[in-house]
């Protein structure tokens, strides 16, 4: 949902800039352009997803959305040929376990925003494999086994963003701010 929202904002900016250039607010105008006015790109999106089918679905959804947004841009900026093909590889979307993946090998150092929706599993609902992943992320810290599974994403995000200007937002339950896990997380 983030990509179409960003492109919608960008289209508004393109339309406003075009209106300022031509003096024709709200009217389509012919301005000869050498370069595409589009700056928000699928190449700026990165991701790690454990489910291969979900990766394929995400790529297909992004390709469809890109085409839809380029058509809307074409309505504003009629003189530029927004060619959708060939499809981009979307190689920045990685299939893998986010807790076992070195994020510095997937995400660029100058990443602006890190947004995620990690799985919520209380300490008593984790499989042996998930518990082992959690303990590995927390380097076996005392009481780490009592942390909600999504807490491991917070730790990975904190380590990845340390010393960087990257802002982070993760969807999670309020349980990560309660009980024994508070000491290890916060």
Where on the chain are the PLM-derived regions?
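SAM-dependent methyltransferase catalytic region
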Residues: 1-186
């Amino acid at each position: 949902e983030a990509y179409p929202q960003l492109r919608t904002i960008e289209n508004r900016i393109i339309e406003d800039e075009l209106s300022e250039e031509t003096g024709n607010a709200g009217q389509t105008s012919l301005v000869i352009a050498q370069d595409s006015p589009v700056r928000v790109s699928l190449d700026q999106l990165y991701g790690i997803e454990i489910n291969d089918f979900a990766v394929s679905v995400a790529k297909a959804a992004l390709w469809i959305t890109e085409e839809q947004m380029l058509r809307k841009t074409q309505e504003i900026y009629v003189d530029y040929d927004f060619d959708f093909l060939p499809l981009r590889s979307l190689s920045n979307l990685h299939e893998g376990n986010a807790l076992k993946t070195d994020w510095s090998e997937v995400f660029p150092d100058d990443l602006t925003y890190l947004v995620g929706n990690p799985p919520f599993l209380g300490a008593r609902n984790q499989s042996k494999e998930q518990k082992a992943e959690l303990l590995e992320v927390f380097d076996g810290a005392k009481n780490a086994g009592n942390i909600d599974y999504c807490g491991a994403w917070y730790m990975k995000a904190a380590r990845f963003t340390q010393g960087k200007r990257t802002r982070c937002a993760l969807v999670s339950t309020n349980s990560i701010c309660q009980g024994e896990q508070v000491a290890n997380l916060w």
